[in-house]
C-alpha cells in the first residue's frame, strides 16, 4: 500500500503603503516571516525551508501601470535572490479600475542558506512599468507548503 503524504499549506499576508516606481528600491519591500505560523520549537532562529507555491500582489492608486515585476530575496538589501525577477500583467478591479492585482505561480523549493540573515523572513520587492500616479503596494501574500 502506498504511503500517504500530507502537505501543510501556509500563507503570509502583508499590507503596506509603499509607493512603487519603475526600479526596485529597498524602501519598497514587504517582509514575510514564513515561520510565524509554525510552533515555537520549529521557528526560533530557523532558516526557512519550504516550497513557495504562489505569490499574489494588490496595488491601489494604480491607474497607469499595466505590469508589475517582483523579486523575492533572503535579505533586506535584495542581494540574495531566491525568486528572480518575474513579470505579470495587472488586472483591474471590476468596479475600481485603479485597484489592480497580479498572481505568480512559483512552485520552487527554497532553503534559506545563501548567506541571508537566516531568520525565516523572505523579502518581496516590486516595481511597475509606469509609476505615474504613485501606485501603492497595498497587499502581498506568499503561499507555501511544507
Annotate each language-model stretch with its function:
Residues 1-24, 119-120, 127-146:
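C-terminal interaction-tip segments
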Residues 10-15, 83-96:
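Solvent-exposed serine/threonine-rich low-complexity stretches and specific carbohydrate-binding patches
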Residues 16-17, 92-103, 146:
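Short, surface-exposed linear segments at secondary-structure transitions and domain or protein termini
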Residues 22, 26-28, 95-98:
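Ser/Thr- and Asn-enriched, surface-exposed coil loops between beta-strands
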Residues 30-73, 143:
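Beta-rich globular "head" domains
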Residues 56, 107, 123-127:
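Residues within well-ordered beta-strands of beta-sheet-rich folds
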Residues 97-121:
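Beta-sandwich interaction modules
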Amino acid at each position: 500500500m502506498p504511503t500517504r503524504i500530507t502537505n501543510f499549506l501556509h500563507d503570509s499576508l502583508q499590507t503596506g503603503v509603499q509607493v512603487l516606481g519603475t526600479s526596485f528600491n529597498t524602501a519598497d519591500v514587504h517582509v514575510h516571516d514564513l515561520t510565524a505560523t509554525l510552533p515555537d520549537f520549529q521557528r526560533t532562529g530557523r532558516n526557512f525551508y519550504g516550497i513557495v507555491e504562489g505569490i499574489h500582489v494588490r496595488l491601489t492608486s494604480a491607474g497607469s501601470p499595466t505590469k508589475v515585476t517582483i523579486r523575492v530575496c533572503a535579505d533586506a538589501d535584495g542581494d540574495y535572490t531566491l525568486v528572480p525577477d518575474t513579470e505579470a500583467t495587472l488586472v483591474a478591479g471590476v468596479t475600481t479600475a485603479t485597484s489592480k492585482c497580479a498572481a505568480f505561480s512559483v512552485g520552487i523549493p527554497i532553503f534559506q542558506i545563501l548567506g541571508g540573515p537566516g531568520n525565516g523572513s523572505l523579502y518581496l520587492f516590486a516595481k511597475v512599468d509606469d509609476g505615474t500616479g504613485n501606485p501603492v503596494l497595498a497587499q502581498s501574500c506568499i503561499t507555501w507548503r511544507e
